């Protein structure tokens, strides 16, 4: 079929109109369910915020403990903190964790750490320190709720503690002042490591759940061009 110049320009104008409106096309296919992505992003952002918040809290608390705990190169052995959940894990083991186990470990760790941190708050000697600890506990409780939201969005049940294993804090046997400070130091240290690991966990999960970029292909019969 012979296409004249006017017809060709008409088809070109039509094509330009279609291309102009392409950005609006994906909106027609949305179901209204954003999936777990926003919950995962929120949880990731919260872990980064808590990392920043903990740096301020730890500086204040370590100064309260005094030397050698507030010295930058102080790295004591872990003596009386065996009950704290450990964040450190072999890299290959960490990579092999499935999503459910990864989330479960985060939820259980913060349930225990929050309990111990509240105990720390109750024994803090100054009102300013108690306020700082209480504020951080509130933020950490928010992180727990956010992790629970991600698990619900992915269809995973919350871990149920076995009878008698619920995280509780009770004053242990009388420590020397130094050993008590050592326990407090390791609580903050382990919390710092968990927040660092959680940021890695949720960044990995965020990338995994990210939908592929929408691609639109136009099939044109370019007769006469």
Curated annotation (Swiss-Prot):
Taxonomic path: Eukaryota, Metazoa, Chordata, Craniata, Vertebrata
Signal peptide limits: 1-27
Single GO MF annotation: cytokine activity
Main subcellular localisation: secreted
Tissue specificity, in the record's words, reads: Expressed predominantly in lymph nodes, spleen, peripheral blood lymphocytes, bone marrow, and fetal liver.
State the protein's name: Cardiotrophin-like cytokine factor 1
State a GO cellular component annotated for this protein: CNTFR-CLCF1 complex
Instruction: Name the coiled-coil region(s).
Output: none
Do you know which PANTHER family this protein is assigned to? Answer: CARDIOTROPHIN-LIKE CYTOKINE FACTOR 1, PTHR21353
- Carries keyword Glycoprotein? yes
Q: Which disease is it linked to?
A: Crisponi/Cold-induced sweating syndrome 2: An autosomal recessive disorder characterized by profuse sweating induced by cool surroundings (temperatures of 7 to 18 degrees Celsius). Patients manifest, in the neonatal period, orofacial weakness with impaired sucking and swallowing, resulting in poor feeding. Affected infants show a tendency to startle, with contractions of the facial muscles in response to tactile stimuli or during crying, trismus, abundant salivation, and opisthotonus. These features are referred to as Crisponi syndrome and can result in early death in infancy.
Q: Which keywords are on file for this protein?
A: Cytokine, Disease variant, Glycoprotein, Secreted, Signal
Glycosylation annotated at which residues?
Answer: 29
Keyword match Glycoprotein: yes
Q: Whom does it interact with, and what assembly results? A: Forms a heteromeric complex with cardiotrophin-like cytokine CRLF1/CLF-1; the CRLF1-CLCF1 complex is a ligand for the ciliary neurotrophic factor receptor/CNTFR. The CRLF1-CLCF1 heterodimer binds SORL1 (via N-terminal ectodomain); within this complex, the interaction is mediated predominantly by the CRLF1 moiety. The tripartite signaling complex formed by CRLF1, CLCF1 and CNTFR also binds SORL1.
Biological role stated in the UniProt entry: In complex with CRLF1, forms a heterodimeric neurotropic cytokine that plays a crucial role during neuronal development. Also stimulates B-cells. Binds to and activates the ILST/gp130 receptor.
Q: Which family does it belong to?
A: Belongs to the IL-6 superfamily.
What Gene Ontology terms for biological process does this UniProt record contain?
B cell differentiation; cell surface receptor signaling pathway; cell surface receptor signaling pathway via JAK-STAT; cell surface receptor signaling pathway via STAT; cytokine-mediated signaling pathway; negative regulation of neuron apoptotic process; positive regulation of astrocyte differentiation; positive regulation of B cell proliferation
Q: Where does it localize?
A: Secreted
Q: What InterPro entries does this protein's entry cite?
A: 4_helix_cytokine-like_core, PRF/CT
């Amino acid at each position: 079929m012979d296409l004249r110049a006017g017809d060709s320009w008409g088809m070109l104008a039509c094509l330009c109109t279609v291309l102009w409106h392409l950005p609006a096309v994906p909106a027609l296919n949305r179901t209204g369910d954003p999936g777990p992505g926003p919950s995962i992003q929120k949880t990731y952002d919260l872990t980064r915020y808590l990392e920043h918040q903990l740096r301020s809290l730890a500086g204040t608390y370590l100064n309260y403990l005094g030397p050698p705990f507030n010295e930058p190169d102080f790295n004591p052995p872990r003596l009386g903190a065996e009950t704290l959940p450990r964040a450190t894990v072999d890299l290959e083991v960490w990579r092999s964790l499935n999503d459910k186990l990864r989330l479960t470990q985060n939820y259980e760790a913060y349930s225990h750490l929050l309990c111990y941190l509240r105990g720390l708050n109750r024994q803090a000697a100054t009102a300013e320190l108690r306020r700082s600890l209480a504020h951080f506990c509130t933020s950490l409780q928010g992180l727990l709720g956010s992790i629970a939201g991600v698990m619900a969005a992915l269809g995973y049940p919350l871990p149920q503690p076995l009878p008698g294993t619920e995280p509780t804090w009770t004053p242990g046997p009388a420590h020397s002042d130094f050993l008590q400070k050592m326990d407090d130091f390791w609580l903050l240290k382990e919390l710092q490591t968990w927040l660092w690991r959680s940021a890695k966990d949720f960044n990995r999960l965020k990338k995994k759940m990210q939908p592929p970029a929408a691609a639109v292909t136009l099939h044109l019969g370019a007769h006469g061009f």
